[in-house]
Amino acid sequence: MVEWTDKERSIISDIFSHMDYDDIGPKALSRCLIVYPWTQRHFSGFGNLYNAEAIIGNANVAAHGIKVLHGLDRGVKNMDNIAATYADLSTLHSEKLHVDPDNFKLLSDCITIVLAAKMGHAFTAETQGAFQKFLAVVVSALGKQYH
C-alpha cells in the first residue's frame, strides 16, 4: 500500500482540479505516439498516423488522450486503493489489447512533460515529485495483470 502525505494528496487534487483535459490529453498522447512510434501499433483503428502532423490533427487521438486523463480522475478519487481501481483496465490492456506495460510509463512521462510545460514555474520540484509518484502508482496498477 502506498503512503500519501496530506501535502501530496493536496497537490494531486489541485493539479486535477485545474487540469485542462482538452489541451493536455491530446498533446500528451500525440507526443507519445510521435516520440515512441512503436506505440502506434495499438491505435491502428485511429486512421492516419503517418506523420507528426497527422497524429496531432487526428480527432481520435485527441479524444483518447482526453479519455486517458479522465481515467486518471478515478485514481485521484481512490488514492488509497489505486490497484483495485484499475484492475479491470489492467486486465483489458493485458489480455485483450496486449499493450506492452512499458507503454504506460512512456505515456505517463509524456503527460508529465506536457503538464510541466503548461504549468510553467508552478510545476515545482515538490509538485513534480507528487505527480510522478501518483502516475507511478497508476502505472504499477495498470501493469498488475502482467505479473
Swiss-Prot record:
Alphabetical list of CDD domains matching this protein: Hb-beta-like (cd08925)
Residue numbers binding heme b: 64, 93
UniProt name for this protein: Hemoglobin subunit beta
Subunit note: Hb1 is a heterotetramer of two alpha chains and two beta chains.
General remark: This fish has three hemoglobins: Hb1 (major) and two minor hemoglobins (about 1-2% of the total). Hb1 has a strong alkaline Bohr effect, and at low pH exhibits the reduced ligand affinity and cooperativity that comprise the Root effect.
Gene designation per UniProt: hbb
GO BP annotations, alphabetical order: hydrogen peroxide catabolic process
Keywords: Heme, Iron, Metal-binding, Oxygen transport, Transport
Pfam families: Globin
Keyword Transcription attached: no
Ranges for domain Globin: 3-147
Tissue specificity of this protein: Red blood cells.
Lineage: Eukaryota, Metazoa, Chordata, Craniata, Vertebrata
Molecular-function GO term, any one: peroxidase activity
